[in-house]
Amino acid sequence: MSSTYAVVNPATGETIREYPEIADDELRAAIDRADRASRTWPGSSTVAERAALVRRVGELHSERRQELAEIVVREMGKPIEQALMEVDFAGEIYGFYADNAEGLMADEPIELLGGEGTALIRRSPFGVLLGIMPWNFPYYQVARFAGPNLVIGNTILLKHAPQCPESAEAMQRMFDDAGFPEGAYENVYATNEQIEWVIADPRVHGVSVTGSERAGAAVAEVAGRNLKKVVLELGGSDPFILLGTDNLDGAAQAAAEARLDNTGQSCNAAKRFIVADELYDDFLEKFREKLAAAKPGDPTAEGTEVGPLSSRTAADRLEDQVKRAIDNGAEVVVGGRREGNYFEPTILTGIEPGDEASQEEFFGPVAQVYRVGSEEEAVELANQTPFGLGSYLMTNDKEQAERVADRIEAGMVYVNLVGADSPELPFGGFKRSGFGRELGRYGADEFVNKKLIRSA
């Protein structure tokens, strides 16, 4: 008999429900269904037909918007307005891939350098894919993975984080109600031990992981032993570099939004704020005011900007990181206190480059602020972590923007803006933030076979 685990509302501490872990024979049956679908569905459906199913999933996000948002508020404490935005964005992603499916799968002619004849690249489905998804954006993350791969004709085994099984159930219902055939999308409540043999199963052809560096490394190790392709979207410690602005209050507001999105529990949230010396004092005061005004509150209430952290474990970890930073010389400018799973928006200064705190990802509403004396110092500090997911740059100097953007070691650089994700733009990082891309054309090309056909 399979065991169960409790899902707890992080805002209230109440148990939402007990959920069963999947038994080995049930998991093998899910792989069987996904394998059968991968052998029949792509050949029995057109790209346009698959796109219509994907489009319907996006429409169901709109039709069930409030219900879906309330689920994620209960499961992880996401403020309701942010939860609604997540549902909307997930729906947009499905719509994008439905709109562009034909172009994504179209033959790609190659101009020959010499000789007669033609050459082209023909795309075909990769097969059964395992998606290992996080708790922090349960709808958005699945859309990034499922949207492109289902229009391609891949079939999906989706392992959700144990914190969000109700979200997972709601998504399975949407795929079923949209009309996907059995096995095209299979929600599985698998344990880490089970996932190891799922990856090794020869019927599973690729794996996509969004999660911690540790989780990604563990999956990549198993996949490597079995020669399986892997896409990893892992942690980040994104810099927010402020070198110039005509609107310091606007810069502080942008910084607050970049740090507090999803209560700071976002891999590409800004976490380290690197500020030019001449702007530092005024910026720090305005930033302090913004974070002090963003009080944690009831995630079900409109206007709440900061909810609880996702679990007691997450709150314990963040509290410990802040304590260790203070013990090593950091100073608290604002915040720093915890109550239950809530943690006050916090600013730390006095962290030295190379300190333990400067090398870690703080997954919560804690900002580190650094003073720099030059552009060179700012770039050096931005690049001195093992991560390289996203980055933010604010400057009035276009030439400086070009120089700094080129030198930042990150997969995404946002210049003079925040919150700029869009379905057509690739998402992914450098260094220990992972490899491969999601979203856009690049995301759709990760799990597709590309065959050269050369004709005389």
Description of each model-found segment:
Residues 108-250, 372:
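Rossmann-like NAD(P) dinucleotide-binding subdomain of oxidoreductase/dehydrogenase enzymes
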Residues 1-117:
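N-terminal Rossmann-like NAD(P)+-binding subdomain of aldehyde/semialdehyde dehydrogenases
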Residues 10, 24-27, 47, 65, ...:
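Residues at or immediately preceding the N-termini of alpha-helices
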Residues 12-18, 204, 241, 295, ...:
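Conserved C-terminal structural/oligomerization subdomain of aldehyde/semialdehyde dehydrogenase
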Residues 15-22, 39-43, 130-131, 240-243, ...:
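Short, well-ordered beta-strand elements within core beta-sheets of diverse protein domains
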Residues 214-352, 415:
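ALDH superfamily catalytic-core signature
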Residues 35-38, 42, 58-65, 69, ...:
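Structural signal for hydrophobic packing residues in well-ordered secondary-structure cores
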Residues 13, 50, 72, 94, ...:
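Residue-level signal for inorganic ion chemistry
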